[in-house]
Amino acid sequence: IVVKADGLAAGKGVVVAQTEAEAIEAVNAMMEDHIFGASGGRIVIEECMVGEEASLLAFVDGKTIVPMISAQDHKRIFDNDEGPNTGGMGAYAPAPVVTPEIRKEVEEKILKPVVDGLKQEGITYQGCLYAGLMITADGPKVVEFNCRFGDPETQAVLPLLDGDLAQIMYACAKGTLTADMVHWKDAAACCVIMASAGYPASSHKGDVISGLDAVDKEDVMVFHSCLLYTSP
């Protein structure tokens, strides 16, 4: 089964329990030890879906939905998909597991019903809608939704955008989004996360990051997160 903290936990509030003992340990850690603070005061226990994970983000203006290139996030801290889940140790785009047929199914049977359902409840959803998916033998299933861009998927997806992101987001806000506004490069991108020692349980703080001046290739970008800049 899967044990989840019901609140925000920076992408780390999920434990895939292989045994009853692991499930009990996860529940106790969240609800008694409060490892996620108030976010773990209530938990969700779900079926553990078997398949390959993928993320499909979409631009939405309230009525029009334009999916982005698919991506796959890798959450385990160690190589070979081992260790605890993190906020994401890397991602690549596009994800081959999301075939054109699956992409169409997700758009029509998952994204559109969500946007339409929100509208029926008086919510005009505009911006980025993130669908975390499990591609199973029975087709795509929803793992989670986020009302934001994915991290680290975005770092792999947006460099492939062949257009003006600001104009696209403005169209989302104004309700004038069209599919022909969004174009993608015929390429692939990969994002690799560098994290401090101890992550994700208790990250070491204060380490100096050096060597970034060596990153001088046109097709390589460095994105910063959770750090403090101080002058030499």
Model-derived features with residue positions:
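Active-site "cap" helix and flanking loop/linker of ATP-utilizing ligase/carboxylase catalytic domains
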Residues: V106-L129, N146-D219, H224-C226
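Hydrophobic alpha-helical hairpins/lids featuring a short glycine-rich hinge
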Residues: I1-Q18
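Residue-level signal for inorganic ion chemistry
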Residues: K4, G87, V192
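Internal nucleotide-binding/catalytic subdomain
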Residues: G13-T154
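Conserved small/polar residues in nucleotide/adenosyl-binding loops
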Residues: Y229-P232
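Structural detector of well-ordered beta-strand residues that form the stable sheet scaffold
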Residues: V2, V44-E46, F223
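A generic local structural motif
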Residues: V2, M30, L177-A179
